[in-house]
Amino acid sequence: MNTQVINQVKQYVTQRAIFIVLILLVIGIAIADPNFLAFSTLRDILQQSSTRAIIALGAAFILVTGGVDLSAGRVVGLTAVVSASMLQIDEYANRFFPDLPHLWVGFPIIIGIVAGLIVGLVNGIIVAKLHVPPFIATLGTMVAVYGLNSIYFDTEPNQSQPIGGLRSDFTVIGSGYIDLGGGYSIPYIVLIAIAVALICWVVFNKTRLGKNMYAIGGNIQAAHVSGIHVARNLIALYAIAGALYGLGGVLEAARTGGATNNYGNMYELDAIAACVVGGVSTAGGIGTVPGVMAGVLIFGVINYGLTFIGVSPYWQLIIKGLIIVAAVAFDIRKYMAKK
């Protein structure tokens, strides 16, 4: 009986480990500085984590299939630049397009999302039709997209000046909020991230595409045998991921009020790390939307919280690296135990 209880406790802790870690992180930082629990601090963490969450959700679609997408960060940079270049105020001295008429704010946003979707389609076709390993395929598109973005931006790599002077009807999406009264508010960008997460949850759990995604990641040969059109599903999943990266890039430009062709650098690694820490298996076939969101929040708490209490950025990198290694090791251990 005692053994059964112990096993049940172990299973409970294992299944909820990511949320336990998040709670412990918040408690630990709050002990070091009680001001960390102020509502404004938690709101800032959520606001800064929102775009990362959308990008991580895109990466999760690919990881669950057993693949990996290294192009995410550069797609974010491309879509941030494209949308920002079309949404500068008319009076700004250094307008990217001096003669561009005043556009409806939604048009460049749609253009950015579609640009991301197109890159995702290209990734999907290369992986599904040409049978190039996802790591190599997306590494190639990562470099190509950065080159394309630099050509569009018309500058040498690593020598860019930000596109500034963005219109307020665009930046309000990233920095505006709904006032709840009493000193409380919810940023628009947080609500957008929650809406995207809910849609992704539906796709993961309530659609044929989601079921096929798990089947492909669990055993691609078995998926073929069971009649799943693997290539078609992979292309669709990569396209969805690209669209999410595109949305993330647009929102990041709105949040920060500018963009350069170096935007999004290393975002793909942060997204993959958040997914893995959130329980998405590197072997494929396993992963949940709540887990991904928790993984993003863990890194949000680490980035903001450790800076809040004065921890060196270099120590923050070490801590993040150790968390990633521990998460992957734990994932591999579970995978080997099942085998």
Where are these regions (language model features)?
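Transmembrane helix-bundle core of multi-pass membrane transporters
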Residues: F135-K206, N233-A236, T256-G264
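Alpha-helical transmembrane segments within multi-pass membrane transporters and channels
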Residues: E91-M142, A294
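Helix-loop-helix "hairpin" substructures at the membrane interface of multi-pass membrane proteins
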Residues: W104-G112, I118-N123, G181-A259
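Transmembrane alpha-helical segments in multi-pass inner-membrane proteins
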Residues: Y238-A239, Y245-G246, R255-G321
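Cytosolic-side transmembrane-helix boundaries in multi-pass membrane proteins
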Residues: M1-L25, V225-R232, I302-K339
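Single transmembrane alpha-helix segments in multi-pass membrane proteins
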Residues: G28-A32, L37-E91, I125-H131, G279-V289, ...
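Short loop segments and helix-boundary regions at transmembrane helix junctions
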Residues: I6-K10, L63-V68, I118-G165, V203-R208, ...
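Membrane-interfacial amphipathic/re-entrant helices at transmembrane-helix boundaries
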Residues: M1-A56, E91-F107
